[in-house]
Regions:
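Charged, low-complexity helical/coil segments in non-catalytic cytosolic or luminal regions
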Residues: 2-180
Length: 180
C-alpha cells in the first residue's frame, strides 16, 4: 500500500485554489467541491523488476561535408552520411516498472499523474483505507506482464540508440534481441 501523501483538508485547499483560477470550469465541478464530494481512491498497480541482457545491431552514420559544383557552376556544400554496421550489448536492471491494474481510468491520465515514490510503500493495514474507496484489479497479471515487457523492450531499443550515438552522429535500423 502506498499511503496518500496529502491529507483531505490539504487536497480541498489545493483544489479550491486551482478551481479559482479556472473561470470557465464546469459548474458541476464547482458543485462537487462545494458538496465536499472529492474522494480519494486507491488504485491497483502491478510492479515488475527484471534483469535484461540484450544484443543489438544497427547502422551508425557519420556526417561529412562535401563540396560540389551546382548546375549553375557555383560550388555548393552538402552534408552526406556514411553508414556503417555496428552492434553491441546492453545490461540493465528494470526496477519497479509500474503497470496500472485498473481499466477505470484512461492510461494517458494515469501517466500524467506521474510515478510514485515506492520507497514510501507500507505493509497492508486496514486503517489506510478508512474513508477511501479502493479498486480491485481489472488488468490480469499476464496482460500487465505484456505491457511491462513492451515498456522494457522500448527502453532497451532507446538505450541501444544512445549507445550507437556515443560513437556515431546518426543511427538507423536498430534491432534488439533481449533476454529478460
Amino acid at each position: 500500500v502506498l499511503p496518500f501523501q496529502i491529507d483531505r483538508n490539504r487536497v480541498g485547499e489545493l483544489f479550491r485554489k486551482w478551481l479559482k483560477g479556472r473561470w470557465m470550469a464546469p459548474g458541476e465541478l464547482k458543485h462537487l467541491y462545494q458538496q465536499e464530494k472529492l474522494q480519494g481512491i486507491y488504485l491497483p498497480y502491478w510492479t515488475f523488476d527484471a534483469k535484461a541482457d540484450a544484443r543489438y545491431t544497427a547502422q551508425g552514420g557519420r556526417r561529412r561535408t562535401v563540396t560540389r559544383k551546382g548546375p549553375d557552376g557555383k560550388t555548393v556544400q552538402e552534408t552526406v552520411v556514411d553508414w556503417y554496421p555496428t552492434s553491441g550489448s546492453i545490461r540493465h536492471f528494470f526496477d519497479d516498472v509500474l503497470i496500472p491494474a485498473s481499466k477505470s481510468l484512461k492510461r494517458n491520465l494515469l501517466d500524467r499523474v506521474g510515478s510514485f515514490g515506492l520507497t514510501q510503500v507500507a505493509s497492508y493495514s486496514p486503517e489506510y483505507f478508512s474513508g477511501y474507496n479502493a479498486e480491485v484489479y481489472t488488468v490480469d497479471l499476464d496482460d500487465a506482464h505484456s505491457d511491462a515487457r513492451q515498456y522494457m523492450d522500448f527502453n532497451l531499443e532507446e538505450m541501444a540508440r544512445q549507445d550507437v550515438l556515443r560513437r556515431y552522429d546518426e543511427v538507423r535500423g536498430v534491432s534488439v534481441l533481449s533476454l529478460i
